[in-house]
Amino acid sequence: MSMTDNVADMLTRIRNAYKSKLINVSFPSSKIKISILDVLQKEGYIKDYITTQKNNISYTEVALKYSVNGDASICEIHRVSKPGKRVYSPIKDLKGYYNNMGIYILSTPYGVMSDREAHIKNVGGEVICKVF
């Protein structure tokens, strides 16, 4: 069975893993998923990730991050732009998510980046997801 939205599947697996208080979560790997994980790691939402090969299929394993008292570092993670309805935004229309406590992850001509980095580079793009 083929998946229509691999990114939404990854975000759902991460969200469910945090709700279940898991330490790691794994899923099939792709370039866009790795780019999104780079942004999440740079912004401090996940600890680390590694990519491994099993039976000629690439898998990514993500080490989830929790606070000292056991709270998840990600409270919300939602897909914005979907295969059936793409959402594009100029940077001036992206106001701070949750009063700048959360981020939008964008796919821009300069690569996948957070809204903070996009504001610095003054570039908009497709809004992949929002994280808080």
Curated annotation (Swiss-Prot):
A Gene Ontology cellular-component term: ribonucleoprotein complex
Gene3D superfamilies, alphabetized: 3.30.1370.30, 3.30.1490.10
Cysteine disulfide partners in this protein: none
Biological source species: Rickettsia massiliae (strain Mtu5)
Protein's name according to its UniProt entry: Small ribosomal subunit protein uS8
Function according to Swiss-Prot or TrEMBL: One of the primary rRNA binding proteins, it binds directly to 16S rRNA central domain where it helps coordinate assembly of the platform of the 30S subunit.
Protein encoded by which gene: rpsH
Keywords of this entry: Ribonucleoprotein, Ribosomal protein, RNA-binding, rRNA-binding
Family: Belongs to the universal ribosomal protein uS8 family.
